[in-house]
Amino acid sequence: MEHLDVGPLKAARGTVKLPGSKSISNRVLLLAALAEGETVVRDLLDSDDTRVMLAALDTLGVRCEPLGTANAYRVTGTGGRFPAKSADLFMGNAGTAIRPLTAALALQGGEYTLHGVPRMHERPIGDLVDGLRQVGARIDYTGNEGFPPLAIRAASIRIDAPIRVRGDVSSQFLTALLMALPLVEGSGRPVTIEVVGELISKPYIEITLNLMARFGVQVERNGWASFSVPTGVAYRAPGEIFVEGDASSASYFLAAGALGGGPVRVEGVGMSSIQGDVRFADALNRMGANVMAGDNWIEVRGVERDDGKLHALELDCNHIPDAAMTLAVAALFADGTTTLTNIGSWRVKETDRLTAMATELRKLGAAVEEGTDYIRVTPPSHWTAPAGGIDTYDDHRMAMAFSLAAFGPVPVRINDPRCVAKTFPEYFTAFGGIAA
């Protein structure tokens, strides 16, 4: 197996220009494809997941033309109706692609199949399918019930009651419905989505609502319990849109700035960000890091304690589910036990991240308690360098988060480092540029 040996690292300093946000990139691509008019998308993330979305849109007949400048595309909108009325779509392991596309395709009146890598066929999609079936969508499971692959058939869509969808497994189900429902033919009469259970990852819904508004569709919400979505309205191309830097990816460099003394600055995301994971900086500050920020940048200059340790903390991570993985590894360097709660969504990501995180932290000597939706980490009393290395489970965020363990007293071997291509292909080059 390919591996990368990192550390032990003693210092971190420098500036990193972040790649575009995955969550924003794939939402913007789909909205631009569904809109009336042309959208120039700039600073689009170049990664496995965005390539999956671009390939799917191409198969569906959407023109996405790369421009001369880096990571810029001109997307010619379809006015809500894809030219291709039948297609077989490979979705890799891109949840941000398969879920919103499933909803949009269910309303197209065509015949489509969606499938992916084996892990994708283990990631639940039943709550979204149940929601779409409430309006008459015809979607069949061709493998295990509740999971991809999916077969979508032409259907007569009708909305005569509120749509109910669970919110406690993945916010992407709600995002998919929100983005698709304006495509339903109608007079603009709104349809109500009712959320069953507690909605997790609320900041990702904020991203969805913000971007829908940029494309001319306003959604009204009643707290987080229900949403009123207009139907029969057209998305309108905004002309040009810039993709923010990825706030989840920023977390690794900010943590490095704390553990390695800094200063480390990330550019492309800051206090004006629409991404919830930007609040990772607040959590890092609570752990004792020296954090400064502007509208489009965040900088960390070491920690306030002379011994370089972080403060242990207990934190509800509903608002930073991806960046919370960085906190779990940073907890190796705390002065006590850190508890991260409300992270049940980790179990349905690229891997079961709760079990994976607990397993790999223990390899380094940490004492770890893994619960249904929480993890409790006590730093090692004696660090160990696992002979077999840190396994990454084909999960980009496992690989990136555990690079921070190299600030400990032992070298760290990262297995399958190329899995970072899902969102940040050049991560280890960028990390090596600021850490030594």
From Swiss-Prot:
Task: Give the record's GO CC terms.
Answer: cytoplasm
Q: Where does phosphoenolpyruvate bind?
A: 22, 95, 123, 172, 353, 397, 422
Q: Which organism is it from?
A: Ralstonia nicotianae (strain ATCC BAA-1114 / GMI1000)
Q: Mind listing the UniProt keywords for this protein, alphabetically?
A: Amino-acid biosynthesis, Aromatic amino acid biosynthesis, Cytoplasm, Transferase
Q: Name one GO biological process term.
A: aromatic amino acid family biosynthetic process
NCBIfam families, alphabetically? aroA (TIGR01356)
The reaction(s) annotated as catalysed by this protein in its Swiss-Prot or TrEMBL entry are: 3-phosphoshikimate + phosphoenolpyruvate = 5-O-(1-carboxyvinyl)-3-phosphoshikimate + phosphate
Tell me what gene encodes this: aroA
State what protein this is by name. 3-phosphoshikimate 1-carboxyvinyltransferase
